[in-house]
A protein has these predicted regions:
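Catalytic glycan-binding domains that act on GlcNAc-containing polysaccharides
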Residues: 16-143
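N-terminal secretion targeting segments of exported proteins
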Residues: 1-16
Length: 143
């Protein structure tokens, strides 16, 4: 199935869903929601991941031309959570996650966070670290 989500510019984005990737069922609103709100709701149990998404991609999964967002420094980093395909593509696919979709990218990030904490996103920690400290999150930041 698909769900429509509005980005901050007011454009509608189609979000694909897959059997192994669950959408947030608790988002119940009368009108369109922003993609930021969708991400924050998805990560409501691990709010540091929403802050990481803001720092990594400014809450974007796709470029304005519709292509999956890739990293500015490392083109292997993809999507809203900037998951590095070199390190994670095989594991993500074996687990049933498609990193090129919004739901797959966020669901894999949640799985990665459960096993490795914030370490995979240490490169952007200067941006989100203050939120982790405020939320009493455990940090695994290499100096």
């Amino acid at each position: 199935g698909q769900v429509s989500v509005s980005n901050d510019a007011g454009s509608q984005i189609k979000v694909d869903t897959f059997p192994k990737q669950e959408l947030v069922e608790s988002i119940k609103v009368d009108g369109p929601i922003t993609f930021e709100r969708y991400v924050r709701e998805y990560f409501k149990d691990d709010p540091i991941l929403a802050e990481i998404a803001m720092c990594e991609s400014t809450f974007r999964q796709y470029n304005s031309d519709g292509a999956v967002l890739t990293g500015r420094v490392n083109k292997s980093d993809v999507g809203v959570m900037q998951i590095n395909k070199y390190y994670h593509l095989e594991r993500a696919e074996k687990s049933g996650f498609d990193l090129n979709t919004i739901v797959g990218n966020m669901a894999y990030a949640k799985k990665l966070y459960k096993s490795e904490g914030t370490k995979p996103w240490n490169a952007s920690s200067k941006c989100w670290r203050k939120f982790a400290n405020r939320e009493n999150e455990t940090l695994d930041i290499e100096s």
